Swiss-Prot record:
Lineage of producing organism: Bacteria, Pseudomonadati, Pseudomonadota, Gammaproteobacteria, Enterobacterales
Gene Ontology terms for molecular function: ATP binding; ATP hydrolysis activity; DNA binding; DNA-binding transcription factor activity
InterPro entries noted in UniProt: AAA+_ATPase, GAF, GAF-like_dom_sf, Homeodomain-like_sf, NorR, P-loop_NTPase, Sigma_54_int, Sigma_54_int_dom_ATP-bd_1
GO biological process, one term: phosphorelay signal transduction system
Protein's UniProt name: Anaerobic nitric oxide reductase transcription regulator NorR
Transmembrane stretches, start-end: none
Amino acid sequence: MSFSVDVLANIAIELQRGIGHQDRFQRLITTLRQVLECDASALLRYDSRQFIPLAIDGLAKDVLGRRFALEGHPRLEAIARAGDVVRFPADSELPDPYDGLIPGQESLKVHACVGLPLFAGQNLIGALTLDGMQPDQFDVFSDEELRLIAALAAGALSNALLIEQLESQNMLPGEAAPFEAVKQTQMIGLSPGMTQLKKEIEIVAASDLNVLISGETGTGKELVAKAIHEASPRAVNPLVYLNCAALPESVAESELFGHVKGAFTGAISNRSGKFEMADNGTLFLDEIGELSLALQAKLLRVLQYGDIQRVGDDRSLRVDVRVLAATNRDLREEVLAGRFRADLFHRLSVFPLSVPPLRERGDDVILLAGYFCEQCRLRLGLSRVVLSAGARNLLQHYNFPGNVRELEHAIHRAVVLARATRSGDEVILEAQHFAFPEVTLPPPEVAAVPVVKQNLREATEAFQRETIRQALAQNHHNWAACARMLETDVANLHRLAKRLGLKD
């Protein structure tokens, strides 16, 4: 089989038709799955010896949240090392990273696998993976044809990463540094709330404004602070962390501003405070609402004038520090109650950010669950950790009052429980492995029984027609995948579809 000009043109058109990088990537993957008639396809970005999924088709949704470290996935490592098309034989002993992650085929292992490394110049920037359940599924495509596909994908990914790099550095195209993948803290989530938060982080990171990050406990406020710092001009300098809630009143001032020898009992030497440590960098003050009013006044002075005084010292030190503060309280209410200074609140909240709770993030819970499953797999040396359909359903309907932190702990506990009840190094998480309070799941949809107005032959054909339509919709009109889903021969399916008027 060879690709026609029309097929390649269609792929190129789909890449241009999308609105934004994510949409283009998804169109590419969906189109490739249809053209190649494979069971699953994925576009991965390479960063720091791991592959990060950008778009998937035919795979469980939690794959988008997983981070595939090369040392834990020998097939992906082989793709990263190769400079060309990689075809894995059906009897390869190397485990496939997507085993158990193809919906409807969880109990089966991938038999056909092709990896296409993607390059920008000499730099590896990503990979395309194509998977099928039939051993010889991709034999009809030559390496040259697959290289054409890889070239189109590499061009799209390279352009997206270059634009991202230029935007993060606030550079014009003519001023671009040599290409390299942009490294930043991974913030997992595609929900509208997280998409908006990421945009706001990109905007404020390039400035030097103070930022107030608000959100419930466990939502990931520290991760937001790291993302801001890493995307800012101060990224080459330290990010210093201080939990204000853990500061005893007796040492809080010393922790913030430092002290000199003899300033108080136990001060046996000079000591720098967090502001000095963060000079030319960023200071993250977690739980800022827990600071006493006296310390709030001293913090305000630093923000106003940029100088500090060590405890016991009359001299002032100039510091250049960007302050990121976080709180799980409503500081406006705290100001009205007299527990937080209004002037400090306004100094800190020049650019406020709000981190949405997990219950408002929709399918992000599944992406995050995939991320934590992969972490557990590596930590415990397992070959795979996957979520059953029942577990996914439970996670999507639980409220998560403890937010992302609660989800992380729940996944870790479930993996340990599932591992204890199953021999081998493969773990499938079921709903019973999660110790959540009672969750009311939506009842399964029951189709209404229609009044019979057809003879048996007409009713049978109507049922067959609707079943094929649904299977085609679920498989993006991929006839080969549809045939496998319906457990019939693809040639017989084509003949039946023609008889039923579904094909010309």
